[in-house]
Amino acid sequence: RSTVIGNSIYKIYDALGYNVIRINHLGDYGTQFGKMICAYRHWGNKEDVINEPIKTLLGYYTKFHEEVEKHPELDDEAREIFTKLEHGEPEEVELWQWFRDESLKEFNRVYKMLGIEFDSYNGESFYSDKMPRFVKELEEKGLLEESRGAHIVDLEKYGLGVALITKSDGSTLYITRDIAAAVYRKETYDFYKNIYVVASQQNLHFQQWIQILELMGYEWAR
């Protein structure tokens, strides 16, 4: 749905004469990949991934959550896998890249049917090497606090709770990658508008994200 809405917005702005950059911000990174890799190693089948990548990978994710109820140690295993992925361990990176490539083939098949194209597929993984800059910037500006080994930005006085920036094991989160993505896009495209088409369930996330960018001194954030 968000893809179709985003494409409609693109057509409107394009017709008005704007130079529009269409970005598909793939959710191709995060702890869910630790869980899917874990599930694949325990119960996976290569041919299933090749034949039906989306259905199969979602099935692995569901299977993981069913099994973790009976075997809680799987959670630790998945976290360790994602940490290895973030650190560039070859086996984890190879599996992650394969999952991404097979999924993208299927996505592109559907996009072609819908007549939708993108100028960029830079998703969450694209920003993995850019995040340390912003974690350091948050620390230098006195915005980052330590809490039980994790790092947070306290937004309580804005009525936005606490934003988790890095977990206690050092792994990053969606909001960390979104901060890096926003600044990268501004520096790369110098946009007049940066329009996100997302579900309403992400309202708090984006309110926190905008507030953090403003506190960092990025006046264009709102």
Q: Model-predicted segments: where are they?
A:
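NTP-dependent nucleotidyl-transfer catalytic core
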Residues: 1-222
